[in-house]
C-alpha cells in the first residue's frame, strides 16, 4: 500500500509540473487577457481522463494500480478546476461578465466534448 501511495505522489508531482509548464506555455503564446492556460489544461485533462478511463478501466488495458496512479495522481494534480473557479471569480469581481460567461461556457462545453472524444478513442484501442 505504501508503495502505491508513493507512485501516486510521484505521479501527482509530475502532473503538477506538467500543468505548470503547459499553462505557462499557453499563456506565453496566447496572452493573459483570458484564462487560456487553465482552459487548455482543463480541456486536455478531460480528454486524457476519458481516454485513460475507457482504455484502462473499461477495456482492461491498465491494472487497477496503474489507473490509480494516472487518474488520482497525475490527473488529480494536472487538472485545475479550483484555478478555473478562482479565475472565473476574478472575472466576476472585475465586472467582465461576457468574459465570465465565455469562460464558463467554453471550458464546460469543450471539457465535455474532450471527455467524450477521449472515451471514443479509448474504445478504439
Swiss-Prot record:
Entry GO CC: plasma membrane
Subcellular localization, as worded in the UniProt entry: Cell inner membrane
Protein's GO biological process: cellular detoxification of fluoride
Keyword Transmembrane tagged: yes
Organism: Solidesulfovibrio magneticus (strain ATCC 700980 / DSM 13731 / RS-1) (Desulfovibrio magneticus)
UniProt function note: Fluoride-specific ion channel. Important for reducing fluoride concentration in the cell, thus reducing its toxicity.
One Gene Ontology molecular-function label: metal ion binding
HAMAP family: FluC (MF_00454)
Main location: membrane
Keywords attached to this entry: Cell inner membrane, Cell membrane, Ion channel, Ion transport, Membrane, Metal-binding, Sodium, Transmembrane, Transmembrane helix, Transport
Binding-site list for Na(+): 76, 79
Bilayer disposition of the protein: Multi-pass membrane protein
Name of this chain's protein: Fluoride-specific ion channel FluC
Amino acid at each position: 500500500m505504501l508503495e502505491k501511495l508513493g507512485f501516486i505522489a510521484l505521479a501527482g508531482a509530475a502532473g503538477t509540473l506538467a500543468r505548470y509548464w503547459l499553462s505557462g506555455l499557453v499563456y506565453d503564446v496566447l496572452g493573459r487577457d483570458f484564462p487560456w492556460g487553465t482552459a487548455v489544461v482543463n480541456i486536455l485533462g478531460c480528454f486524457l481522463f476519458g481516454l485513460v478511463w475507457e482504455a484502462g478501466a473499461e477495456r482492461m488495458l491498465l491494472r487497477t494500480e496503474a489507473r490509480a496512479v494516472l487518474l488520482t495522481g497525475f490527473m488529480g494534480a494536472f487538472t485545475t478546476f479550483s484555478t478555473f473557479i478562482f479565475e472565473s471569480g476574478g472575472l466576476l469581481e472585475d465586472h467582465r461578465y461576457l468574459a465570465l460567461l465565455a469562460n464558463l461556457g467554453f471550458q464546460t462545453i469543450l471539457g465535455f466534448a474532450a471527455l467524450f472524444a477521449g472515451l471514443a478513442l479509448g474504445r478504439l484501442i
